């Protein structure tokens, strides 16, 4: 999860620089090249034999999808839905408030990303050391809601936008790191691969629906309506996490 967060942060920094140098078409060619490199890396991996084979069936899915794991799947779906929907309009918000030019977005993202990594460390430590993962996740969802409210209502300058973006990234990076860790400790060992597959599918479905719905809302209504949508999703998610059982098969919270 942490590596995914780092990759996303790097894309925010490098993307505007590449597009300013070679244009939007060059940016997509760069993405295609990186995809080919990724495929070569996957093909170069040694195939390891599974410890135990099991037949994929409806019963395997039903046994894997416990209440706890469904909550985690919905959590990663919601996180990436909020991310994708928010960043459909984030560049427009920056331009409308004349914070920085499109080519200089990295001036804003770089300090926010650096500060967010510093801010997430104590949250991760508290979560792991004191077994308070659920409550740290709820705190981070609250921070997501706070950041969306500021983006929605505030008259933004560079300083306020930087602080708000840092709050958003602290919450996002913390959740992105904690959810896969919690999933691996919650799922049964023999069905962990299936659980991780469903989890990853939920993540990318969240990205797809976030981009599609966020773009549709912006097209029909306006920029602020997108943030109202992400706030609505985050509030439902917060209550869903509140109802999540404290005890799981592999992890107990005290």
Kindly give the residue locations of the regions a language model identified:
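Juxtamembrane intracellular "pre-TM" segments in multi-pass secondary transporters
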Residues: 45-75
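Short amphipathic helix-loop junctions that connect adjacent transmembrane helices
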Residues: 88-104
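C-terminal membrane-cytosol helix-exit motif in multi-pass small-molecule transporters
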Residues: 32-51, 240-245
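Helix-to-loop junctions at the C-terminal end of transmembrane segments
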Residues: 19, 118-132, 218
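Pair of pore-lining "gating" transmembrane helices in MFS-fold secondary transporters
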Residues: 66-86, 166, 170
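Helix-loop-helix hairpin linking two adjacent transmembrane segments in secondary transporters
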Residues: 2-43
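A late C-terminal transmembrane helix in Major Facilitator Superfamily
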Residues: 186-220
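C-terminal transmembrane helical hairpin of 12-TM major facilitator-type secondary transporters
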Residues: 133-179
């Amino acid at each position: 999860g942490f590596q995914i967060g780092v990759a996303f942060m790097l894309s925010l920094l490098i993307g505007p620089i590449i597009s300013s140098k070679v244009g939007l078409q060059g940016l997509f060619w760069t993405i295609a090249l990186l995809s080919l490199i990724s495929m070569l890396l996957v093909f170069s991996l040694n195939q390891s034999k599974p410890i135990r084979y099991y037949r994929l069936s409806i019963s395997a899915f039903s046994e894997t999808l416990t209440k706890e794991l469904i909550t985690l799947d919905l959590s990663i779906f919601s996180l990436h839905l909020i991310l994708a929907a928010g960043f459909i309009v984030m560049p427009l918000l920056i331009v409308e408030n004349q914070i920085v030019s499109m080519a200089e977005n990295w001036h804003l993202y770089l300090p926010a990303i650096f500060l967010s990594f510093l801010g997430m460390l104590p949250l991760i430590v508290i979560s792991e050391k004191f077994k308070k993962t659920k409550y740290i996740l709820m705190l981070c969802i609250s921070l997501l809601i706070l950041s969306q409210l500021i983006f929605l209502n505030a008259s933004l300058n560079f300083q306020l936008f930087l602080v708000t973006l840092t709050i958003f990234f602290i919450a996002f990076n913390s959740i992105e790191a904690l959810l896969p860790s919690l999933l691996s400790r919650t799922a049964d060992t023999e069905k962990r691969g299936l659980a991780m597959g469903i989890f990853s599918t939920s993540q990318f479905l969240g990205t797809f629906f976030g981009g599609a719905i966020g773009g549709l809302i912006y097209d029909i209504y306006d920029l602020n309506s997108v943030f109202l949508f992400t706030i609505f999703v985050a509030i439902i998610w917060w209550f869903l996490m509140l109802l999540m059982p404290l005890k799981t098969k592999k992890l107990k919270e005290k």
